[in-house]
């Protein structure tokens, strides 16, 4: 949850799967969705409605400096899941997502 907004924003900004994001935004209630970015907006609204939008890594003892370690750990332990992403996420991409997500 804490990295989901930046995770999906990464793919939205790459424009690697705009149509699926538009369809998901519509499924989430954005009737007039026309841009992939509408999915990220709907995701943030859903997080707010569920009371999880304010989750912070810092509240769980995660330090900003740990982004590199978290990225390496994600790739080492969950590497197979990375093949399901719409485009390749390398170590630097993962680290950046963690850093942008940090609060």
What role is predicted for each listed range?
Residues 1-3:
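Conserved phosphate/anionic-ligand binding catalytic regions in large, soluble enzymes, centered on
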Residues 5-8, 25:
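Conserved protein kinase catalytic domain
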Residues 9-13:
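Glycine- and Gly-Pro-enriched alpha-helical subdomains that act as flexible
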Residues 18, 23-103:
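C-terminal charged capping/lid subdomain of soluble metabolic enzymes
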């Amino acid at each position: 949850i804490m990295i989901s907004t930046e995770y999906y924003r990464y793919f939205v900004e790459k424009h690697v799967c705009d149509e699926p994001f538009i369809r998901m935004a519509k499924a989430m209630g954005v009737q007039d969705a026309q841009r992939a970015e509408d999915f990220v907006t709907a995701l943030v609204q859903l997080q707010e409605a569920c009371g999880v939008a304010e989750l912070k890594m810092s509240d769980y003892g995660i330090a900003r400096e740990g982004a590199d370690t978290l990225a390496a750990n994600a790739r080492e332990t969950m590497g197979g899941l990375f093949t399901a992403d719409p485009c390749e996420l390398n170590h630097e991409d993962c680290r950046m997502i963690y850093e942008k997500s940090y609060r």
